[in-house]
């Protein structure tokens, strides 16, 4: 992959997101112009820190437009871009919108959204992923959609899928089975893995062993692992570092993890996140963090209860 730390723009392409500490990070100035300026600043800082993979999605508000404009200005010549389809942003740039996004994994939605992504990102788009592929969505059983994906793959675009929810492992294993003429349909998988929710680990190890690229999202559990008085504060203090670095370093300690995504909303955060590649966690710290794991159903219920802010 392009770099061991990537940058996801979920927090920067729209005015609200599910993230603890967002009010502190962004304040009240969240106009489109303000968010685009912030996004450019963070992209500049990420690139300067060595980050070469950027991850967006159709549902991340104007993230694709912000990123496309930044790239067209020549500011990230070595950046590899991945985007996702399957959710549509409905927030209308309102902080109080009742519905921020809606999921639709139909073939019609794919055709519409890949055209939109290509219009905004052009030739910069290298990887296109199903957004939150789950067993219950039926996406892996939709033969018309899979045939459409195959034709897109044959045109040269790399395909992947992301997962969410307590049954991530089952979705990963199911997605790995899809093949075209004996070759994998999906070259990458992007999943949630963190010290609170490590249940997808064995399936991700299987994906890595099979030659797929493994990208990790939500390594900081939507900000829950970033506080000095949070679950990783003690470990970070003993190691003389910060909780965000510990959270990301815990992912890098997994031999199957290729890229861990930073969800930074500020320049300071992305610089700190990028430096996590230099943090080596001792065995006793890793063992202590293993004790933090929650039952997947509890973790995802807690996540679902987080407010958009």
Q: For each of these PLM feature ranges, what is it?
A:
Residues 15-37, 95-111, 136-137, 235-238:
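Active-site mouth loops of central-metabolism enzymes
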Residues 78-104:
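Structural motif corresponding to the early beta-alpha repeats
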Residues 1-84:
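N-terminal binding-site loop/beta-alpha segment at the start of enzyme catalytic domains
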Residues 11-13, 60, 87-91, 134-136, ...:
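Feature marks short, surface-exposed loop/turn motifs that line or immediately flank catalytic pockets
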Residues 30-46, 103-121, 167-179, 247:
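Short, acidic/polar
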Residues 132-309:
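Beta/alpha (TIM)-barrel catalytic core signal, keyed to glycine-rich beta->alpha loops juxtaposed to Asp/Glu
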Residues 2-5, 50-53, 75-79, 122-126, ...:
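Short, well-ordered coil/turn segments that N-cap beta-strands
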Residues 116-139:
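Active-site groove signature of glycoside hydrolases
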């Amino acid at each position: 992959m392009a770099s061991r730390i990537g940058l996801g723009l979920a927090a920067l392409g729209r005015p609200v997101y599910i993230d603890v500490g967002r009010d502190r990070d962004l304040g009240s100035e969240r106009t489109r112009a303000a968010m685009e300026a912030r996004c450019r600043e963070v992209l500049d800082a990420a690139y300067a820190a060595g980050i070469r993979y950027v991850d967006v999605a159709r549902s991340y508000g104007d993230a694709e437009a912000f990123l496309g404009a930044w790239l067209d200005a020549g500011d990230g010549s070595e950046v590899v871009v991945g985007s996702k389809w399957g959710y549509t942003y409905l927030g209308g740039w309102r902080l109080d919108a009742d519905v921020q996004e809606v999921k639709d994994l139909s073939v019609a939605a794919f055709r519409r959204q890949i055209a939109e992504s290509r219009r905004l990102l052009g030739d910069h788009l290298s990887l296109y992923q199903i957004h939150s592929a789950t067993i219950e969505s039926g996406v892996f059983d939709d033969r018309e959609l899979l045939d459409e994906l195959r034709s897109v793959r044959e045109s040269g675009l790399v395909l992947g899928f992301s997962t969410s929810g307590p049954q991530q492992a089952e979705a990963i294993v199911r997605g790995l089975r899809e093949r075209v003429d004996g070759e994998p349909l999906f070259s990458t998988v992007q999943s949630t893995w963190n010290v609170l929710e490590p249940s997808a680990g064995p399936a991700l190890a299987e994906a890595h062993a099979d030659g797929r690229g493994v990208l990790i999202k939500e390594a900081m559990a939507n900000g829950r692992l970033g506080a000095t008085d949070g679950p990783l504060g003690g470990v970070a203090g003993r190691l003389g570092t910060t909780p965000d670095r510990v959270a990301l370093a815990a992912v890098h300690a997994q031999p199957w993890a290729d890229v861990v995504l930073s969800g930074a909303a500020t320049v300071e955060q992305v610089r700190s996140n990028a430096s996590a590649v230099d943090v080596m966690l001792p065995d006793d710290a890793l063992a202590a963090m293993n004790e933090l794991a929650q039952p997947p159903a509890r973790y995802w219920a807690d996540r679902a209860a987080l407010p958009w802010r």
